[in-house]
């Protein structure tokens, strides 16, 4: 029970921060021996818990877009999210086997954590003035650019949130808009990834310990709820440097532990 609760909390806390939930789940899951088909079922379900948190926090905005989709700004919002989703959908489905092989390499994740941390520090220094303050004001080409940045997150340890937020900032979005776009882009991306993973692993999935899986879902939902509500305010005050230094420290520790085996 403690293992399921811990991994659910880790998923919820790390999924929407630029620190790679995959790397954290990989290391902690390996330490706890939480692997195999039941582990895959658990991984898929807890991701859905994290997605639900975004939908709950931004429910009014999502509902507003859905009910006014024919209006120009609502249409632009939905268009930009879906355009940004396309590269990951197409490339992810095409390269699924290779991505799965990479996901089995904790050392790759550790190196990506460190490299990504350094990249965040560099980008924070490079980006001085944003020119886009709302998702609706993005062009389709810019949204597509963010989508290709998201593809980088297929390498474990890169972080989907980190790649999309930093990519958005490099392309002209301010911190708040970049963070929000990353949240909204997570909805189709994570739902699509979960659905594709279900399809590919259906024959080996197991719902043994359904109670523990449900516990992980709830833990991921509640912890993600806290993160999503507080993240934008935090980066507005402190920027992304704290996450960069954490990545470098955690990635280095992860690499040392792996090499000491």
UniProtKB/Swiss-Prot annotation:
EC identifiers of the protein: 3.6.1.27
InterPro entries in the record: UppP
Subcellular location: Cell inner membrane
GO biological processes: cell wall organization; peptidoglycan biosynthetic process; regulation of cell shape; response to antibiotic
Transmembrane parts of this sequence: 1-21, 38-58, 75-95, 103-123, 138-158, 178-198, 212-232, 240-260
Major localization listed first in the record, in broad terms: membrane
One Gene Ontology molecular-function label: undecaprenyl-diphosphatase activity
Catalytic activity: di-trans,octa-cis-undecaprenyl diphosphate + H2O = di-trans,octa-cis-undecaprenyl phosphate + phosphate + H(+)
Keyword field: Antibiotic resistance, Cell inner membrane, Cell membrane, Cell shape, Cell wall biogenesis/degradation, Hydrolase, Membrane, Peptidoglycan synthesis, Transmembrane, Transmembrane helix
Metal-binding in keyword set: no
GO cellular component, one term: plasma membrane
Membrane topology field: Multi-pass membrane protein
Comment field (misc): Bacitracin is thought to be involved in the inhibition of peptidoglycan synthesis by sequestering undecaprenyl diphosphate, thereby reducing the pool of lipid carrier available.
PANTHER family, alphabetized: UNDECAPRENYL-DIPHOSPHATASE
Described purpose of this protein according to its UniProt entry: Catalyzes the dephosphorylation of undecaprenyl diphosphate (UPP). Confers resistance to bacitracin.
Protein family per UniProt: Belongs to the UppP family.
Protein name: Undecaprenyl-diphosphatase 2
Organism: Paramagnetospirillum magneticum (strain ATCC 700264 / AMB-1) (Magnetospirillum magneticum)
Name of the gene: uppP2
